[in-house]
Structures are given as C-alpha cells and as structure tokens.
C-alpha cells in the first residue's frame, strides 16, 4: 500500500484474515507444539528481539543455549560431558530439525571424506528408508549425495537390518534410522541395525556410522521407554537430531543436533567468525535468528525437569493408547500404530467400505478436526492411512469428542458411500 494505516486497523485486518486458518488445537496433522504456559509465552515475548547469533552482546542467552545443548546431549547419553561445564557437549541449537538434519548429514559426509582419503571422483551415498522426512531428500540433492532409499511393504513401514546390510558400501557416508516415523509414529529397530553394522565391520566389511533422526521421538522415548537403547549408548550412533518444537513442547521453531563427541564433528565445518568484537565459532546454516525459541525451550527444561516430561508424555501416551483401543473396536478400522511407541495413532479402513480414507478425512473436517490422510511411501503406495498426533492441548474430553465424531463420520459415509470422490494424496510432511 502507498499509505499507512492506524495500528489497530492493521491488527484487525490481519487478525480477521487469520481466523480462516481454523483452530490449531484441532489440527491433529501437525507434530508442532500449539500450547505453552502463559509464563513461557511471556518470556518468549520479552526475548523475540534478541539475535541468537550476537553471543557477545547477549551472553546470558548464549549461556542458556549452551545449557540446553548440554541437557539434550546428557539426555541422549553423549560421551565426555562434565558437570557444571555446558561447553563439554558437542552440538548446536537450530531453527528446527530440518537444519539439524542438514548439519548432521554434512558432518557424516566430511567424516567419510576423511575416512576414504582420495574422495574426488567418488559419489557418496546415504542409506535410509523411503519413509524419511523430505528434508533428507533435500540434503542429498543440495549436497550432492546419492540417496539409497530402502522400500517399505504392506504391513512393514520401517527399515530392517537386512535391508541396510544389502545397501551399504565403501561410499556410504552413513545410515539414517528414525525414532518415530512421521508416517506412523513407529520406532525403527536402531539397536538391531547397529548390531548388524557392528558385525559387518568386525568381519572386515565397511565401517558405517548411524545418525538417528529423533525429530519426533527424541523427547518422548527417554521418558516413556527409558530402558530402550537407541542413542549414544550404542557406539555406532554418532549423531542425533531432535525437534524442540515437537515433543520438546516449545513453540516453533527450535531444534538441536548433538554428536557423540567432538571427534565426530569435523573442525573444517566450524567457522570462526570475528563478529561484533568476538571470536565466535559457528556451525549453522542460518545466521541471524531470534533467541526466544531457545529461551522457551530452557523454560520447559527448568519448569518440567525429567519428572515433569515423564508425566506429560505418560498423559499423552495414555490418551493416544485410549484412542487406539477405541478405534480398534470399530469394525471399520485397522490400527497400524496404537500410540504406545510415541503418542501417534495411525489407522486405515478395514476391507472395502465403498469409500476411502480421504473421504473420512474430509468428513472429519466438517466437525472442525484436521486429520490427514495420505498414501504410504514406496513400495507401499497402495496403502492409505489416517494419522492422529496427540499433543498437549488434546485433553481426554477432546479425545472423546474426536472418537464420537469419527464414529458419526463413518456412519454418515456408510449411508452415502461416495465411492472415493477424493483423490489419493501422497504424504506431505
């Protein structure tokens, strides 16, 4: 516009348009946090103007970031951590898991270069399931790495150790294993994959590291399943990424990537910048970004502690498992994941109902619920599923309302049998 307007009018204009987005609390498609304590919101509002990169100018914010990284590294059992020394952890905060994945992948590629010596003329590859988040495809394309996708099949939506062993070779920079897939919420068999790679290396085969994509499960599994070994307790795991704005319970966007130790982050990737009077080591793709997301994450760490996170995850898991049990009793539904691994329930229609999962998703929208329907990855694209992500804010009362609305929607579709008017859609992360 050429002319200015009254601030209240500008606010109202934008506020009214945003009402068309609908309620984020009823958006069961997203893993992203949609509710925080008012005190956290106040802290974040007070610090949104602080630039995370200006560490000399905002030393308290920089110290908070280092403490967050150290706590994440400790949660995942990283090596060489020293009490009262947050800088002993090797890792960084990021704008989200997408940036964290890029940084973890770059470290794998540089370590592969160091391992093979003369790497020019060789094409590095990365082994992962076809169920990975799209950022892994972006990483391979942007940084010239061959993606080796391991296919799914009907009834199995995670990768297997046998698939991994058949795919790795001397040009493999690493294997990606997922702690909580975005398609179904299932946990991949990380310990079994590492054991298979250990046996391969011990027999004179290639020595391939593992990166764990814990974007969805990294802040769930340590509290719900503390005895499950998937992290740096496995010597083959060299790096882990996690999203703070998912089950870290913080508004977007914040994530972390941590390494088992400093030797797994090549020094060539760390820039030392003389910026605003300070020598600042940095390993990020972004430069300027607000510090308030890290402050919000720090608030959650202090406010909840291990005990609080455990109680929150147990409550979410209870709600998810209740939903899974209720859906299992509906003869229309075949439950794929019941919410016991992480608080995600995925299900599909049982048999030929005369309509599709996409019709169910559309019908639920008439009640205000956003429940995504999508087809599974290669080679299971003939399978369509619906997914419910249980987050803070989805109370037991809302879960009961969702169940009742789902039963009503299925009954309505039984009467009209639209025959699948809505086209199949592939997964959108």
Report the location of each language-model feature.
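N-terminal entrance/gating region of PLP-dependent enzymes' catalytic architecture
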Residues: 1-88, 368, 406, 429
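Secondary-structure capping and boundary motifs in well-ordered enzyme cores
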Residues: 60, 93-100, 128, 132, ...
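Buried hydrophobic packing segments
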Residues: 65, 69-72, 100-109, 136, ...
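Short Gly/Ser/Thr- and Asp/Glu-enriched loop/turn motifs at secondary-structure junctions
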Residues: 86-88, 121, 337-344, 381-383
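Conserved PLP-enzyme active-site core in the AAT-like
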Residues: 92-268
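PLP-dependent enzyme catalytic core of the Aspartate aminotransferase-like
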Residues: 200, 380-429
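Active-site C-terminal subdomain of aminotransferase-like
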Residues: 206, 223-226, 230-343, 348-352
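Conserved PLP-binding active-site segment of the aspartate aminotransferase-like
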Residues: 343-355, 368-403
């Amino acid at each position: 516009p050429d002319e200015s307007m009254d601030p209240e009018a500008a606010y109202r204009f934008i506020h009214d348009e945003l009402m068309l987005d609908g309620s984020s609390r009823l958006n069961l498609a997203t893993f992203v946090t949609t509710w925080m304590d008012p005190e956290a919101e106040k802290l974040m509002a007070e610090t949104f103007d602080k630039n995370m990169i200006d560490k000399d100018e905002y030393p308290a914010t920089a110290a908070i970031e280092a403490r967050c990284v150290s706590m994440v590294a400790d949660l995942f059992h990283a090596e060489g951590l020293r009490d009262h020394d947050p800088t002993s952890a090797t890792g960084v905060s990021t704008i989200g898991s997408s940036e964290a994945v890029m940084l973890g992948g770059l470290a794998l590629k540089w370590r592969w270069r160091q391992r093979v010596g003369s790497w020019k003329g060789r094409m590095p590859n990365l082994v992962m399931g076809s169920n990975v988040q799209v950022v892994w495809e972006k990483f391979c394309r942007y940084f010239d790495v061959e993606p080796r996708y391991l296919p799914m099949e009907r009834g199995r939506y995670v990768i297997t150790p046998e698939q991994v062993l058949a795919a790795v070779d001397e040009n493999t920079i690493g294997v990606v294993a997922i702690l909580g897939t975005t398609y179904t919420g299932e946990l991949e068999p990380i310990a079994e994959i590492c054991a298979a790679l250990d046996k391969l290396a011990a027999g004179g085969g290639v020595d391939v590291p593992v990166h764990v994509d814990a974007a969805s499960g990294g802040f769930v599994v340590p509290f719900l399943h503390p005895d499950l070994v998937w992290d740096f307790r496995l010597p083959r795991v060299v790096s882990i990424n996690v999203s703070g704005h998912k089950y870290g319970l913080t508004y977007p966007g914040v994530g972390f990537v941590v390494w088992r130790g400093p030797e797994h982050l090549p020094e060539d990737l760390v820039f030392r910048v003389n910026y605003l009077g300070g020598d600042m080591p940095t390993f990020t793709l972004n430069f300027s970004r607000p510090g308030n997301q890290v402050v919000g994450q720090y608030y959650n760490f202090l406010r909840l502690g291990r005990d609080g996170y455990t109680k929150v995850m147990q409550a979410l898991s209870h709600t998810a498992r209740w939903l899974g049990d209720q859906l299992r009793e509906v003869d229309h539904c075949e439950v794929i994941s019941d919410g016991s691994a992480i608080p995600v329930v995925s299900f599909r229609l049982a048999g030929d109902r005369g309509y599709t999962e996409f019709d169910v998703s559309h019908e639920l929208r008439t009640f205000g619920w956003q429940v995504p329907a999508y087809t599974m990855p290669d080679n299971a694209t003939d399978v369509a599923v619906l997914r419910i992500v249980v987050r803070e804010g989805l109370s037991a009362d809302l879960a009961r309302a969702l169940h009742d609305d789902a039963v009503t929607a299925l009954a309505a579709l039984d009467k009209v049998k639209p025959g699948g008017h809505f086209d199949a859609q592939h997964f959108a992360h």
